[in-house]
């Protein structure tokens, strides 16, 4: 169950190896919705999907800015972004 006032930017890896970035207040619920084909045209035909990265933010605005910035990146830069974040978490 999500706690009040939690805001996340998340990245899914789709079955076709593409990435999808999004905003949610509950990462687990949102992953289940994507896999059920609920509320997302892009991932509906690319299931199953798996959350491979998420970041927590203090505000919705910060999380949606991170989402927008990620979506503007090229595939190569998205790969680099995810590798850097993975290394930071180790």
Curated annotation (Swiss-Prot):
CDD domains per the UniProt record, alphabetical: GIY-YIG_UPF0213 (cd10456)
InterPro entries hit by this protein: GIY-YIG_endonuc, GIY-YIG_endonuc_sf, UPF0213_domain
SUPFAM superfamilies in the cross-refs: GIY-YIG endonuclease
Domain GIY-YIG, residue spans: 5-83
Xref: Gene3D superfamilies: GIY-YIG endonuclease
Family as reported in the entry's similarity comment: Belongs to the UPF0213 family.
Protein name in the entry: UPF0213 protein lwe0147
Origin species: Listeria welshimeri serovar 6b (strain ATCC 35897 / DSM 20650 / CCUG 15529 / CIP 8149 / NCTC 11857 / SLCC 5334 / V8)
């Amino acid at each position: 169950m999500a706690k009040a006032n939690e805001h996340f930017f998340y990245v899914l890896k789709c079955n076709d190896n593409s990435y999808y970035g999004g905003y949610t207040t509950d990462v687990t619920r949102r992953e289940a919705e994507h896999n059920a084909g609920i509320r997302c045209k892009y991932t509906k035909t690319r299931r199953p999907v798996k959350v491979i990265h998420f970041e927590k933010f203090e505000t919705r605005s910060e999380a949606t800015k991170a989402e927008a910035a990620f979506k503007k990146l090229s595939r190569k830069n998205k790969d680099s972004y995810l590798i850097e974040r993975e290394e930071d978490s180790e």
